[in-house]
Amino acid sequence: MRVEELASVHNDDSHAPPHTLEDATVLQIVPALREEPIARTVLDVASALVQSGARALVAAEEGPLVGELTAFGGEWAPLVNATVNPFRLRRSARTLERLIASEHVDVVHAQSIGGAWIARMAATRIPVRLVTTLLDVPPSGLRGYWAGALARGDWVITPSNFAAAPVMARHKIPIERVTVIPRSIDVAAFDPAAVDAARVEAVQDAWRIMQTARILLVPGRVAPWNGQLILPDVARLLLDSGVRGFVFVLAGEHRSYRKYARAVAKEAEVKGVQAFIRFAGHCRDMPAAFAAADTVVVPAIEAPVFGRAVAQAQAMGRPVVTSDVGVLPEHVAAPPEMPEEVRTGWVAKAGDAGELAHALGEAFALDETAYRTMSERARHFAEYMFSPRSAVAATHAVYGALLARPLADSGERVGSAAKRAEGR
């Protein structure tokens, strides 16, 4: 149901501020309820809220997921927030303020730049706890200015330390107001138990690779920022060290950046490693592609937006060798940040063929028992770090921590807003 249809039921003066999440009303703000990762996460959080006894509202422009939201007991409120037009933002802020008051909203969680501005403006006029979620990659310039609203919540959720560090420094956010919750992946689809042998064989047949070859899967578009140009050097170093029987499979679209793809092929020819590098093109069955691989290689030289390939590979129980840019190192359990006994992969310096080859040499050196153990660790690590269930639980913990505080202690903004509300 739309929130307006329920306003008469919930709009009374008997509302007492809750101290637990089960008694709370939580309003999440996203641009639109379309099938995209952020909206899917919002629905996961809302569904769990309803199951716990809380009331879950989502303010967004209409989309195909509205029906799914209302089917499990969530409520939708129309709200334009995918804008930085100041006039539309002010109008939406007034709409949000009325919604917070009429529905007795306890926590507002803004997950877009426009939504954060709207929530911030509304929260200066009515007391409410405000949670914001940072973007995956820290923006700069004018977009960085607008994105600053995402740093002004009473509690800030960030998908990574990489995303949080510059924002925390710029806006002087204390660490106790920040929680890292990695973006979730579909750990049910990316599950070794869900991929049968026929799917794996189909992928291998499409790649025209012998089943005895050690497949080093390089997922992602063949593009400059993904760093595939280093692979011929890595292949040559491996061959010179006596390693044989491997092939790099570049599983990603390679026509958008033809010049770069040709440069990779030319470098392979110059190094004499053409037979060890295969351009496989776009793969429609990535779980099967990961299952076919022995090791997954992510040689990016620029920070990726999400870094999902590293998470998906580990969910499929595959060791990962990745570069040290952006969020990628945070998505692998590897020394020195983690003990050797919990290792799920290796992190190499971006653009360093020697480090990448050395890491792959260590991966090749694993015996069957050690490989199986690392594979199991990788799967468990992915379930803990990247499952939707983990993301929901961590988000609910943030809501619960805020609700446990007196509203006036949620920040200077909320405290002053509460005083203004009392004086009206």
What is each model feature region?
Residues 36-44, 214, 221-237, 262, ...:
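A conserved mid-protein helix/loop that constitutes part of the nucleotide-sugar donor-binding site
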Residues 162, 184:
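Carbohydrate-associated surface elements
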Residues 334-353, 363-368:
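Conserved acidic donor-binding segment of nucleotide-sugar-dependent glycosyltransferases
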Residues 362, 369-385, 394-397:
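A short, well-ordered alpha-helix in the C-terminal region of glycosyltransferases
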Residues 110-116:
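Short His-centered aromatic/hydrophobic patch
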Residues 124, 130-161:
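A conserved, positively charged/aromatic
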Residues 58, 319-322, 327-332, 339:
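Short hydrophobic beta-strand element within catalytic cores of glycosyltransferases
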Residues 261-281:
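Nucleotide-activated donor-binding/catalytic signature segment of Leloir-type glycosyltransferases, i.e.
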